[in-house]
Amino acid sequence: RSELAAVRKTAGNAGDPNRKVSKKERDLITLRNKLRDDWIKSEYTQVTLNDRQATVYEKGSEQWKAAIEKAAKAYEEMFFKHDVRLVGLICRVQQMRCLTELGRFDAALDCLPDVTDYEESDNAQLRKVWFDSFVLELEALIGKGDLQRAVQIATKTRLTKAEQRTPQAKKILFLRAKAELALAEKLGPDKKKDKAKLLADAKRVL
């Protein structure tokens, strides 16, 4: 407790750019950062326990739905608490996953604005946040029946070479083909060329 009080006091004093910071103060600031990181990790672990609890129930059951709802809410709270940190963005994507599993596709897609900006990021961790959200975006679009949009973004989005070797890339191709096949089924007889193109591309990517 005394260490934590000293850390808080030092952290406040160190905010003055004209003030020389001693080694002891630097050590205390390092300790503060470690304590904060450890606390955030413990928070995240607690949140994921809600998620894991759902696995003991039969998928689709009322108990499963209640557990996933609880997890989605916990992830959302964690996101708003740490939205400027990586862990907050990860929680936003996990919330999106929970909502998609519950069939709440519009609510899941509402999470996207918080993570889509990282598609062009050079930071591998932030890029992964976007990559994970992209897979969920496709699932949500297909789930709500917006097949045209799903096909459009699946065919236009470019993945890095490293991403192309991941299991998620295979899932993206599967979802792309799934959307193309479903969209082809909906096209009328006046759209034979479009239908043939969709079927051919689905066959190619599978």
Short names for language-model regions:
Residues 1-206:
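Acidic, polar-rich low-complexity tracts and alpha-helical solenoid repeat scaffolds
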